[in-house]
C-alpha cells in the first residue's frame, strides 16, 4: 500500500496482514484462480471474503470422510485478526484449519470481494 505523508507517496507494507501456509485441494485452487480472473481479484481476497461470511454464519457442517485427496501447499496473506478468528472457529468446530478454509469457499460473495488493485491503495499517513 502507499501512504501519503507530507504530500509525498511512500510505499509501505500492510502491517495488518499475516502470511500463512496451508494445504487445500488443487481443484479448489484452480476454481479460485478462474473466479479471481473473472472478477479481477486475487485468490487471497476471495478466501478472505469467504472467511468473513462463514464466521458470520457461526457454524458449518463438514463431513471429514469427504476430504479431498488432492491437497497441495498454498501460501497467501490474510488480515491477521481474521486469521486468528478463523483458527479459533476451527477449534470450536473441532476441525482442521484446512477443512475450514475449504468449506469457506462456499461462502464467497463475489459482489463484495476486494479488487486486485486494493493492495495499491493510498492511505493518509
Question: Which sequence ranges carry the predicted segments?
Answer:
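A detector of short terminal or domain-flanking linear segments
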Residues: 1-70, 77-81, 88-125
Amino acid at each position: 500500500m502507499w501512504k501519503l505523508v507530507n504530500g509525498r507517496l511512500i510505499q509501505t507494507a500492510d502491517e495488518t496482514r499475516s502470511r500463512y501456509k496451508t494445504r487445500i485441494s488443487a481443484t479448489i485452487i484452480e476454481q479460485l484462480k478462474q473466479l479471481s480472473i473473472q472478477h479481477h481479484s486475487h485468490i487471497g481476497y476471495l478466501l478472505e471474503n469467504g472467511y468473513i461470511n462463514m464466521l458470520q454464519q457461526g457454524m458449518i457442517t463438514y463431513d471429514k470422510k469427504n476430504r479431498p485427496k488432492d491437497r497441495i501447499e498454498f501460501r497467501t496473506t490474510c488480515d491477521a485478526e481474521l486469521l486468528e478468528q478463523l483458527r479459533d472457529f476451527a477449534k470450536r468446530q473441532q476441525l482442521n484449519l484446512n477443512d475450514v478454509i475449504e468449506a469457506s469457499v462456499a461462502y464467497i460473495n463475489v459482489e463484495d470481494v476486494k479488487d486486485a488493485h486494493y493492495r495499491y491503495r493510498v492511505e493518509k499517513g
